[in-house]
């Protein structure tokens, strides 16, 4: 059996849609009530909380379980949505060992639920789904802090049936997303089937079951990942860079391997050369308190993985959230600095060629954004961490193509001087703290631009048209000939040449009238009076003749090769016939 001392605390990320109960769930686990102090009960800051194994066993209510679990506890990360999951990275991989995806059992899947699942699938992270808010199912009688099986037994058969229906809607949606899933107590193999735990984060029902499943997953599938060397040099990831009164710039980090001591030399990733500095103070949260509550810190001389810790040291201003932090010695300082720099360079994109610009607040979110846009085959010219600067704005303004004269900003600010410049420029800026929204907004913008470009083309291009001279509707024979016509396909416009089916151009449409009013064009199905200059009825044209708009070759190329899919069905049919007529004598016409 693995020695308990060699297993570090598993890092757990809580993900899910806004207002589905992530923070309430964590509060229940911690036994604190941080939610009440947060605006709108939505998590606002990054935090990390260590829940020791003894506290978990106490929640489970069975002291005999103490010897079954080797891990020293669970380290919970809590942030808005899945921001921390992408921030906490390690060489392009996810740092979190486990994840909880919280779903409101009554509302079902929402956009950020899907995004959470995509991220977890991409990083192959084991997770459990928490079907929250069971206390809001009609007729549910809450049993405070009770395990799910016990509270479920106390419900009426109608309520049990309602829960099962809602639960299997969640399970069905997980199947649609490519995950085999089942209620956790019916799962025989957690490696093949995802466990879904029904809970109420508000009443505490089902919370012991969530902890049990997490410990089980850690024990069964992560034992090798959790082994670490307590005596080795500390390795971690920067969670947040924070200005603290009396301390200046500090780093909130998650240490996931080795030990970090006061006085250690550390190397931290930044936009330029890596930062090399000495740890002045280590501030570790007490057990069951959150990193974001500064008054609860205690100074410590060293920390061992896994732990959330605040570092005070000189020169931390340029540190990047999501970047590596590593302990170095005099002997390997240059080597460690080189490794840290190469890791940062792997993420940054600066090709200088065609594409959009992406700015993000952390390396992890930058990676996630780049991944999503590349998945959609959107070219990226530049991607880096940091706020949108005046330089970025000027650079983007030099791009002529409106599809790429774009800056995407995730969780970043726009500098005031950049904002002034952007107001006067044609650069399009999209900012949000939700990745999928940025992708959607850009897709919508691209569609609008393409439609605008097509509209412009449509306005200048001569489109296909087909019409028939109606019998008994010759109003004037020549100079110009005025006849009644029915539009059989496409559109006819004034000032366009017309031809017969044999290819002979017979004249130009000089005017169109409908019910005595002059009109610029007429679409399929319309019957109008048409003035044709250059044609004489009885010579070049006669009643019952079918004529076509003589589309110039250059325009025909654009219609066939660039905007064909945007044409209406009758326009496509008319164009196809027109091209066939034109290519009888010249097969390469408009090719």
UniProtKB/Swiss-Prot annotation:
Keyword annotations: GTP-binding, Initiation factor, Nucleotide-binding, Protein biosynthesis
Molecular-function GO term, any one: translation initiation factor activity
Annotated region described as G4, given as residue ranges: 132-135
Region (G3): 78-81
InterPro entries: EFTU-type, P-loop_NTPase, Small_GTP-bd, T_Tr_GTP-bd_dom, TF_aIF-2_arc, TIF_IF2, TIF_IF2_dom3, TIF_IF2_dom3_sf
Residues annotated to bind GTP: 16-23, 78-82, 132-135
Organism superkingdom: Archaea
G5 as annotated region, ranges: 200-202
GO terms under cellular component: cytoplasm
Stretches the record annotates as G1: 16-23
Span of domain tr-type G: 7-223
Keyword Repressor part of the UniProt annotation: no
Entries under Gene3D superfamilies matching the protein: P-loop containing nucleotide triphosphate hydrolases (3.40.50.300), Translation factors (2.40.30.10), Translation initiation factor IF- 2, domain 3 (3.40.50.10050)
Cross-referenced PROSITE patterns: G_TR_2, IF2
Pfam name, any one: GTP_EFTU
Region (G2): 41-45
Function per UniProt: Function in general translation initiation by promoting the binding of the formylmethionine-tRNA to ribosomes. Seems to function along with eIF-2.
Similarity remark: Belongs to the TRAFAC class translation factor GTPase superfamily. Classic translation factor GTPase family. IF-2 subfamily.
NCBIfam families: aIF-2, PRK04004.1, PRK14845.1, small_GTP
Protein name, entry field: Probable translation initiation factor IF-2
Species the sequence originates in: Methanosarcina mazei (strain ATCC BAA-159 / DSM 3647 / Goe1 / Go1 / JCM 11833 / OCM 88) (Methanosarcina frisia)
Encoding gene, per UniProt annotation: infB
């Amino acid at each position: 059996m693995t020695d308990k001392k060699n297993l570090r605390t598993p890092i757990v990320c809580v993900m899910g849609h806004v207002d589905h109960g992530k923070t309430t769930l964590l509060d229940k686990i911690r036994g604190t009530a941080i939610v009440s102090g947060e605006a709108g009960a939505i998590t606002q800051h990054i935090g990390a909380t260590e829940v020791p194994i003894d506290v978990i066993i106490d929640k489970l209510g069975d002291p005999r379980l103490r010897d079954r679990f080797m891990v020293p506890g669970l380290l919970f990360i809590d942030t808005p949505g899945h921001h921390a999951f992408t921030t906490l990275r390690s060489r392009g991989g996810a740092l979190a060992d486990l994840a909880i995806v919280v779903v409101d059992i009554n509302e079902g899947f929402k956009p950020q639920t899907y995004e959470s699942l995509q991220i977890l699938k991409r990083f192959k992270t084991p997770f459990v789904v928490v079907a929250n808010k069971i206390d809001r199912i009609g007729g549910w009688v809450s049993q405070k802090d009770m395990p799910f099986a016990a509270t479920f037994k106390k419900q009426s058969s109608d309520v049990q049936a309602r829960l099962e229906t809602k639960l299997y809607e969640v399970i069905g949606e997980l199947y649609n997303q490519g995950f085999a899933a089942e209620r956790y107590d019916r799962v025989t193999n957690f490696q093949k089937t995802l466990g879904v735990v029904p809970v109420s984060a508000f009443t505490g029902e089902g919370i012991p079951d969530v902890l049990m499943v997490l410990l089980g997953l850690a024990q069964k599938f992560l034992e090798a990942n959790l082994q670490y060397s307590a005596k080795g040099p500390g390795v971690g990831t920067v969670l947040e860079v924070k200005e603290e009164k009396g301390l200046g710039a500090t780093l909130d980090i998650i240490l996931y391997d080795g030990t970090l001591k006061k006085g250690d030399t550390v190397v931290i990733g930044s936009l330029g050369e890596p930062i090399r500095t000495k740890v002045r103070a280590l501030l570790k949260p007490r057990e069951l308190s959150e990193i974001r509550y500064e008054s609860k810190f205690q100074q410590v001389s060293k920390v061992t993985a896994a732990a959330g810790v605040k570092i005070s040291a000189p020169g931390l201003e340029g540190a990047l959230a999501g970047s590596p932090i590593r302990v170095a010695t005099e002997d390997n300082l240059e080597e460690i600095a080189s490794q840290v720099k190469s890791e940062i360079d792997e993420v940054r994109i600066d090709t200088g060629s065609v594409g959009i610009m992406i700015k993000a607040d952390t390396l992890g979110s930058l990676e996630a954004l780049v991944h999503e846009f590349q998945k959609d085959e959107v070219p990226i010219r530049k991607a880096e961490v940091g706020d949108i600067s005046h330089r970025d704005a000027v650079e983007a303004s030099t791009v002529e193509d409106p599809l790429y004269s774009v800056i995407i900003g995730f969780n970043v600010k726009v500098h005031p001087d950049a904002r002034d410049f952007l107001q006067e420029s044609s650069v399009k800026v999209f900012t949000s703290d939700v990745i999928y929204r940025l992708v959607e907004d850009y897709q919508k913008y691209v569609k609008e631009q393409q439609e605008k470009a097509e509209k412009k083309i449509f306005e200048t291009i001569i489109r296909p048209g087909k019409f028939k001279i109606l019998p008994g509707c010759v109003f004037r024979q020549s100079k110009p000939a005025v006849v009644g016509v029915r539009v059989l396909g496409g559109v006819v416009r004034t000032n366009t040449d017309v031809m017969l089916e044999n290819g002979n151009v017979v004249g130009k449409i000089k005017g169109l009238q409908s019910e005595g009013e002059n009109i610029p064009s007429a679409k399929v199905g319309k019957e109008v009076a048409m003035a044709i200059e250059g044609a004489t009825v009885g010579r070049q044209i006669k009643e019952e003749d079918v004529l076509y708009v003589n589309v110039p070759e250059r325009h025909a190329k654009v219609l066939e090769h660039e905007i064909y899919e945007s044409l209406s069905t009758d326009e496509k049919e008319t164009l196809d016939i027109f091209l066939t007529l034109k290519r009888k004598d010249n097969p390469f016409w408009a090719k």
